[in-house]
């Protein structure tokens, strides 16, 4: 399956009004257990490169405050919805993958693939067991969406296998795709 197949699924579900109602009462369309090749940077719409650059810079800063995403304006509504009243979140992917607090997973992945290019151990775990007690702290609603990413080199090409708990096809996918390209 490729991005075009995912797109067609969502178009068909929308046309046939096959919705799941989320906790806010909003109609959503789900595709549970999808496995596909991310061969396009967007499922719907066009990536906003200016915003992507800001989000990646924020990830690299390892700040867990959404007010640091866009110094010139408001953070995106989705981040505001997920954040505490103080702007704190759990899902800064740079913090989760590069900070010593989380064992500098990126460094370990690079070392592993440098030492053993055929390895299947080059994994980064984004989510964590403690998220059950952290996701709603101080008014947050941020249960990390990416569970884990495995990296492999095959035929001199880096392959990422991304396992998501949840991913928004309109906004989230574009930014997650860009993050994996940066990684």
Where are the model-predicted features located?
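Terminal, non-catalytic protein-protein interaction segments that mediate quaternary/complex assembly
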Residues: 1-182
């Amino acid at each position: 399956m490729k991005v075009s197949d995912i797109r067609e699924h969502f178009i068909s579900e929308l046309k046939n009004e096959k919705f799941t109602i989320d906790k806010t009462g909003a109609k959503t369309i789900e595709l549970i257990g999808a496995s596909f090749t991310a061969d396009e940077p967007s499922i719907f719409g066009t990536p906003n490169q200016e915003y992507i650059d800001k989000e990646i810079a924020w990830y690299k800063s390892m700040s867990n405050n959404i007010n640091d995403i866009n110094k010139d304006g408001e953070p995106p509504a989705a981040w505001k919805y997920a954040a505490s009243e103080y702007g704190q979140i759990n899902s800064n992917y740079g913090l989760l993958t590069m900070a010593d607090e989380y064992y500098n997973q990126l460094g370990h992945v690079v070392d592993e693939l440098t030492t053993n290019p055929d390895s299947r151990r080059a994994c980064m775990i984004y989510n964590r067991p403690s998220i059950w007690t952290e996701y709603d702290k101080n008014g947050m609603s941020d249960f990390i969406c990416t569970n884990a990413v495995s990296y492999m080199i095959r035929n001199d090409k880096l392959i990422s296998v991304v396992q998501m708990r949840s991913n928004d096809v309109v906004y989230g996918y574009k930014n997650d795709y860009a993050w994996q390209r940066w990684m």
